[in-house]
Amino acid sequence: KKGKTPWNVLLSINPRTEQVSFSKGLDLGNDKGIVNISGEWIKATQKLNSPYTSYTRRGFSAGYSNTFRKVLRFDIGLTGNIGGMNTKDDPDAYTGEYTKVRDNVFRANTSLAWLLNKSWITNLKLDASVYYNDNKSHAHTPYSYASEQPAVHAEQEGYFIAGKLPYHFFADQIVDSKELDYAASLKYEWNRRFKNVTSNLKAGVQWKGTGNVGDGEYYQNPSLAPNGYRPRSYSAYPYMHNVSLYAEESLSVAVGSTMLRLMAGLRWENLFISGTQYDKLNTLSPRFNARWQLNENIAIRGGWGVTEKLPSYYVLYPRQEYRDIQTFGVSYNNNESAYVYYSQPYTLL
């Protein structure tokens, strides 16, 4: 919540969840602005018979807002969640088995609105934000085999001698994701009124950068990874940038005792990813909507538009799959074996 508010404290306990939270809005007085703060602690248990599989989250937020000289409205804020779980001490788990999860999210945002209220402009607003999601999981898992198992981890096409997995061992799988996004926008708004017609014009430009700087998916000891497993580095993928321009006009016209609302808009987007075929991908999306409110209970509406959806990050960079074909195998000594595989990466068409 924004604005001046009293202290608000919440305590909640049930068999699965424990929660404590607080919030407060402070008026600094003498037109110095308002500060809002909040905090939260939550512990959620997945299984009542195993409290060690619980997730703990600590959330916080802080924000400042003020209007200078009645024409400049400024806001800035920071929010975050620090969470995770650790089942290492679970006595019900297999000896030595555990899972650790780190889930931290931070977001900073600011905005500046120029409340001009002129004949040619109503307001101009600038927004900017940064989003960071640090998510890391560590699974320490036991494996047991009755016979010797080959393990192919080749990441190039060709013939390779397969490695061998031990009969009994622990393997540590890591998934390290660090999503880091940036965004900024500038919006122009113009509100007008002509007799029985109300007009609202919006136009602006937006930019967003999306990427991941995490180490990705891998095993601490690559030789203990399961057969066919390959690591995947998230930071190896380039950033995806999106720039868009848009304009939208909304009209409200009183027709007798009824109200007719018309909206027309046009949006242009440009997607570019350095070093790829998507360095100059443009889309144009027009749309039109109409609504005729006959009375409180009856309305007629319709619309037309063309939407072109830009590919998401997971569509552009799917997991690389491989085909591993055993071409030779031999057994010798005390039931030991050797295998030769032909590995071939799949190619997207």
Residue spans of the language-model regions?
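Outer-membrane beta-barrel translocator/receptor signature
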Residues: 1-48, 54-60, 71-72
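Repeated loop/turn-to-beta-strand initiation elements of outer-membrane beta-barrel proteins
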Residues: 4-7, 30-35, 70-76, 117-124, ...
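Transmembrane beta-strands of outer-membrane beta-barrel pores
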Residues: 11-17, 28, 41-45, 78-86, ...
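Hydrophobic, lipid-facing positions within transmembrane beta-strands of outer-membrane proteins
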Residues: 18-22, 58-62, 104-110, 180-186, ...
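Residue-level signature of outer-membrane beta-barrel architecture
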Residues: 26-28, 66-70, 112-118, 186-192, ...
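Flexible loop and strand-edge segments within Gram-negative outer membrane beta-barrel domains
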Residues: 43-61, 65-126, 130-160, 171-179
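Outer-membrane beta-barrel transmembrane domain signature of Gram-negative proteins
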Residues: 157-262
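Structural signature of Gram-negative outer-membrane beta-barrels, strongest in the C-terminal barrel
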Residues: 236-349
